Curated annotation (Swiss-Prot):
Localization per Swiss-Prot or TrEMBL: Cell membrane; Endosome membrane
Taxonomic lineage: Eukaryota, Viridiplantae, Streptophyta, Embryophyta, Tracheophyta
Modified residues (Phosphoserine): S869, S906, S938, S961, S1035, S1084, S1115
Active site residues per record: D997 (proton acceptor)
Post-translational modification summary for this protein: Autophosphorylated. The phosphorylated form is essential in the perception of flagellin. Dephosphorylated by KAPP. Autophosphorylation is inhibited by the binding with avrPto1.
Membrane-spanning intervals of the chain: 807-827
Residues with Phosphotyrosine modification: Y984, Y1043, Y1050
Topological relation to the membrane, as annotated: Single-pass type I membrane protein
Signal peptide extent: 1-23
Tissue: Ubiquitously expressed.
Miscellaneous: After flg22-binding, forms instantaneously a heteromeric complex with BAK1 and is transphosphorylated within 15 seconds. After activation, the receptor is internalized by endocytosis and subject to degradation.
Intervals, Cytoplasmic compartment: 828-1173
Gene name of the encoded protein: FLS2
Name the record gives this protein: LRR receptor-like serine/threonine-protein kinase FLS2
Amino acid sequence: MKLLSKTFLILTLTFFFFGIALAKQSFEPEIEALKSFKNGISNDPLGVLSDWTIIGSLRHCNWTGITCDSTGHVVSVSLLEKQLEGVLSPAIANLTYLQVLDLTSNSFTGKIPAEIGKLTELNQLILYLNYFSGSIPSGIWELKNIFYLDLRNNLLSGDVPEEICKTSSLVLIGFDYNNLTGKIPECLGDLVHLQMFVAAGNHLTGSIPVSIGTLANLTDLDLSGNQLTGKIPRDFGNLLNLQSLVLTENLLEGDIPAEIGNCSSLVQLELYDNQLTGKIPAELGNLVQLQALRIYKNKLTSSIPSSLFRLTQLTHLGLSENHLVGPISEEIGFLESLEVLTLHSNNFTGEFPQSITNLRNLTVLTVGFNNISGELPADLGLLTNLRNLSAHDNLLTGPIPSSISNCTGLKLLDLSHNQMTGEIPRGFGRMNLTFISIGRNHFTGEIPDDIFNCSNLETLSVADNNLTGTLKPLIGKLQKLRILQVSYNSLTGPIPREIGNLKDLNILYLHSNGFTGRIPREMSNLTLLQGLRMYSNDLEGPIPEEMFDMKLLSVLDLSNNKFSGQIPALFSKLESLTYLSLQGNKFNGSIPASLKSLSLLNTFDISDNLLTGTIPGELLASLKNMQLYLNFSNNLLTGTIPKELGKLEMVQEIDLSNNLFSGSIPRSLQACKNVFTLDFSQNNLSGHIPDEVFQGMDMIISLNLSRNSFSGEIPQSFGNMTHLVSLDLSSNNLTGEIPESLANLSTLKHLKLASNNLKGHVPESGVFKNINASDLMGNTDLCGSKKPLKPCTIKQKSSHFSKRTRVILIILGSAAALLLVLLLVLILTCCKKKEKKIENSSESSLPDLDSALKLKRFEPKELEQATDSFNSANIIGSSSLSTVYKGQLEDGTVIAVKVLNLKEFSAESDKWFYTEAKTLSQLKHRNLVKILGFAWESGKTKALVLPFMENGNLEDTIHGSAAPIGSLLEKIDLCVHIASGIDYLHSGYGFPIVHCDLKPANILLDSDRVAHVSDFGTARILGFREDGSTTASTSAFEGTIGYLAPEFAYMRKVTTKADVFSFGIIMMELMTKQRPTSLNDEDSQDMTLRQLVEKSIGNGRKGMVRVLDMELGDSIVSLKQEEAIEDFLKLCLFCTSSRPEDRPDMNEILTHLMKLRGKANSFREDRNEDREV
C-alpha cells in the first residue's frame, strides 16, 4: 500500500514538472519577443519596463503594459505616454496572439517594422505621436481584422497605396501630420465600414475622391493642410451621418456645394483658407445642429444669407477674409449661442448692428477692414464676456460707449482707422486690457489718467488723433508695455522721464507732436527698444550720451527737430541700426568716421543740417550692404566724392546735392548698378562726365548733375539708360552735340540741357518732340525746327552770274511780280463776292471746311438717331455752354456728342467754329480727347463728335460712386496724364492753346483709367484769345468758380498760367476729396481748398495727413511716403500762387511729377514699419 502511494506521488510530481516545462517552452517566443522589445528601448526615464523580468511562471502577463488572454498569451501591448525612446523591434511579430499595439505619445524612431504584417490577429495599431519614419509597411494592408489604424503625428512618408482599399475591416484611419504625398486613392469608397478618415497636415495632392460620398457610415473627414485641388464633391450631400467635415488650408476652388445642406448631422464645417468662390449657399441654414461654421479666407461673394441666422446652436461663425458684401443684418442677434464671430476683411457696408449686444456669450468680435458705418451700440457693455473687440479700418463714427467699462474681461480693443469722435472715456482701468489701439480717429481731449491703471497693457496706440495736453508721468506705471504710439497728435511739453520705467518697451513712436525740451536721460533704461521715432517735434539740445546704451535699436528717426551740436561719435555703439535719420536739424561739425560701425544701415539720412568737412571714405566702405537710401544733401560738405561710394552696390538712391563737393565723379561709381535715383546737383564738380560710369546703370530712373562745372560732351552711354525718366544736365559747361540716342529713350519724359555750350542740331523725336524751349536756352549754337531755335542752315558756294544773265533775271522777276499783283486783285474781288454770298447762305462754305478738317461731317439727323433724338436719358454731362450725350452710330460705335448751346454763342462765332475745329482736329496726344467729327447747321446745330470714355470723368471718380483712385502712385500717374495733355496744349503746337476751364468734370477716363483732357477748344470756339480779347457777344464763358485763376476772373486775361492754377486745384482735390469751395475751418470760418492745404502743411505732417482722403492717409507706412505727399502738396501750392508769374509752367510741373512718381514707385520699406498699430 505504501509502495503504491509512493509510486502515485512520483508520477504526480513528474507530470507536474513536465507541465511546467511544457508551459515555459510554449510562451518562450512571446517572452523573447518582449525582451527584444525592451532591448530596443534606449531610454526609459520613468522605469516602466523595470518589472519586465522572469520570476516564477507566467509572470510576463503581469508586466507593465502587458495584457494576456486566459491561456497566458499576450493580446495587448499598451504603453501610452511613458516617455520611451528607441526603436520598435521586428521581434514584435512573434506575439502571434497580439490584438492591440498602442504606443501613443512616446519617442519611438526608425521605421515601422515590415514584420508587423504577420500579426494576423491585430485589430488596433496605434502609433500616434512618435517619430516613426519611412513608408507605411505594405503588410499592414494584409491584416484582415484591423479596424483601428492610428499613425498620426509621425514622420511617415510615401504615398497612400491603393492596397489600403483591400483592408475592408477598417473603421478608423488616422494619417494626420506626417509627410505623406501623392493622391488619395479613388477606391477609398470601397471601405464601406469607414467612420473616420483623417489625413490632415500632409502633402497630399490631386482632387478629393468622389467615392468618399458613398461612405454612408462616415462621421469624420479631415483632409486639411494639404495641397488638394479641384472642387468639393457634390456627392458629399449623401453623407447623412457626417458630423465633422474639415477641408481647410488646401487649394480647393469652385463653389460650396449646396448639397452639403443635406448633411443633417453636421456639427462642424470647416472650409477656410482655400480658393472657394461664389455665394454662401442658403442651404447651409438647414444644418440646425451646426456649432462651428468657418469658411473664412476664401473668395466668396454675396451677402450673408438670412438662413444662417436660424442656426441657433452656432458657437463659432467665421466669414472673414472674403469678398462678402451688403450690411450685417440685425438678425445676427438671433445667434445667442455665438461665442466667436469673425467678419473682418470683407466689403460689408451699412451700420454697425445694434442687436449684437444680444450675443451675451460673445468672447471674440472682429469686423475690421470693412466699410461699416454708424456708431457702436451704447449698451455695448452688456457683452460682459467679451475678450476681443476689433473694429478697425471702418467708417465708424461717434464716441466709444462709456458702458464699455463693464466689459471687465476685455483684453484687446482695436478701433483704429475710423472716424470716431469725442473724448477717450474713463473706465479703461477697470478692464483687463493688454492691447489698446484707437489711432487714426478724431478723438479729442487728453489721455485719461485711468488708462495708466491698465497694469497688464502691452500695446497702447492713440496715434493720429486730435489729442492735446501732455504725456503724463503716469505713463511710467505701464511697466509691461511693449509698444507705445502717441504720434500725430498735438501733445506738448517735455517727454516725461518716467518713460524710462518701461523697460520692456520695443517700439516708441512720439513723432509729429509738439514735444519740447531735451531727450530725457532715463530713456537709456529702454535697453530692449528697437524702434524710436521722435521726428517733427520741437526737441532741442544735444543728444544725451546715455541714449547710446540702447544696443538693440534698429530704427532711429530724430529728423525735423532742433537738435544741435556735433553728431555724437557714440552713435557707433548702435550697431543694430538699419534706419537712421537726423535730417532737418542743426547739427554742425564733421561726419564722425566712427559711424563706420553702423554696417547694417539700409537708410542713412543726415541732409538739411550744417555739416562741414569731407565724407569719411571708411564710413562709405562700411555701408557696402546698404540697399535703400543715402542722403547727405543740403549741407556744407567739401572735398571730393570718395571713391568708396562705389562700394554701395545695392543702394537704390543717392543724394549728395547742394553741398560744396569738388573734383570729378569717381570712376568707382560704376559699381552702383542698382541705383534708381542719383543727385549730385548744386556742387562744384568738374571734369568730363565719365562715360564708363553710366554704361551699366540701366536701372536708373532719375539723374541730376545740374549746377556744376562739368565739361566735355554728353556721354553716349546715357542713351543706354532704358529706364531713365528724368535727366538734368543744365547749368554746366558741356560742349559738343546732343546725342541722337537720347531721342530713342521711350521712358525719358524730362530733359534739361539749358545753360551749357552745346551746339548743332537738336533731335526732333522722342523727348525732344515736346521739350520746353527753356530747357535748351543758353546754348547759343543749337539749331533746329523748334522755336525759338535758329534753323539749321547749309552753307552753299556763291554763284556768280554774268551781267547779261543778271539783266534777264531782273526782267523776269519784274514780270512775275506784276502777274502776282494782278492775281491778288482777282482773289480779293472773288472773296468779296463770296463773302456777300455767305451772308445769304453760310452753309456754302462747309465743303471747304470738310476738306480742311479731314474729319467726318455728320448730318444732324445722324446724331439725332444716335442719341435717340437727344433723349435726356442719354445726357452724360452738361454746362451753360453745352450738353453732352451718349450715342451709338449705326455701325455700333459708341460716341459722345457735344452739342453747343447756340444761345451762348454769337453769330460771329461761326467763323471761329470753323477755324478752331480745324485747329483742334490737328492736335494729337494720347491725353487729349480726340475729335472724330462735327455737325453744323446754321442757326440750328453746332456739335462735335467725340469718342465715348467708359470710366466717366474725374469728378465722379473723386466725389461720386465710381471706383476710387486710392494709392499715391495711382494719383500721381493720373496727374502725369493730365499734365502731359495740358503741356502739349501749351507748348506742343505752333501756338499756345489755353484750356480756360480745366476742372475734374472735363477730365475723362478711358477703359484703362488713363486720363484724357476734354473741352480744350470751347474757349477758342467762343472767340477768346490770349490777350484777353473776345468776339463773343455774351459773358457765358466765365470758367468755373473754385478753379478759376484770380487774374482771369478779374482781368479777363487768358494765359497758360491760368490753366496751371486750375491744375493745382485739381491736384489738391484729388488728394483730399474736398471740393475747392464751401469749406470751413475748425472755427467755422470760410476758407478755400488752397487755404486748407496750406494750413495743413503749416501744422506739420500730422496736419498734412489729416487733410488727405482717408484711403490715402491709411496707406502711408513710411516717412518717405509722407515726404513725397508733402512735396506733392507743396507743388499744388506753387501752382496756385496768386501771381501768374510765380507759377511754374506745365513742363516744370510734369518734371516734378515724374520725379515724385519715381519716388512713389520705388518705396521699399516694410508696410508695418511705420503703420500705426
